[in-house]
Amino acid sequence: MRNLEKYLSVSEEVKQALAEGKPVVALESTIISHGMPYPKNVETALNVEKIVRENGAVPATIAIIKGKITVGLSKEEIEYLGKEGLAVTKASRRDLPVLCALGANGATTVATTMIGAALAGVKVFATGGIGGVHRGAETTMDISADLEEFAMTPVLVVCAGCKSILDIGLTLEYLETKGVPVIGYKTAELPAFYTTHSGFKVDYKLDDAATVAKAWAAKLEMGMQGGMVVANPIPEEYAMDLDYINSNIEAAVEECNRLGIKGKETTPFLLDKIQKLTAGKSLAANIQLVYNNAKVAAQIACELSRI
């Protein structure tokens, strides 16, 4: 029954790089459609691809285009997703079969980007922040599908920790239960997206891309299921004040609850609200941390290709 070719499209550049054992870095597309306003989203996505190239790897931005999981978007496709914005379906694992069957378009979350990367054979992925356990999840059960994907899908994800709108402690507990290693890149503390500190420890602090690549290669070579989180702090000069950002996050969460916003609309609403409350400072920080993650992911992918 398996007929992957029908649903997967890999760009020639990515296909060739993988065939030659060159480093490739997967990139998500929800950040383009739902994470930032146009045209800043397109500009950021193209800059991220450029940073990956400058650090020796081939970028593979992933989305669902006309019913196919497309690994390696063209500039035109990135522009399209950026312009369409929130009109594009935010696609997680559950959405894939329906969107593919309908020949529809979708922007991939962390979970779906991991699926696309794994199907194509890409082992390293750079994003902003991963999804996790939402605040109040003990009553709402609002837990991102990203976490379950980490338990199943063999892709290393470089991020700036989980988005600080989440319950960081419970997110780490969930990842521990699922056996997912959380690596701090040059840090013993999990970064909290906009800030370098969260008060929570990572499982291991590793200080260079080569060591991270070795640990990831060991997991792959042992045939162990699931991925790896590499938490890379936002550069200090772009980090936001902890109390300032937390008070704005709390205000945004309060409004979200008051308006009854739930499910996959929650994160885009909160990020947009926080951007407005901080007069655009949070968006500027978001862009810088994504750039930093792209650089580190490319370095890890290069080291992995040498093993």
Report residues per predicted region.
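Active-site glycine-rich loop that binds ribose-phosphate moieties when present
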Residues: T109, E138-A151, V155-E176, A210-K214
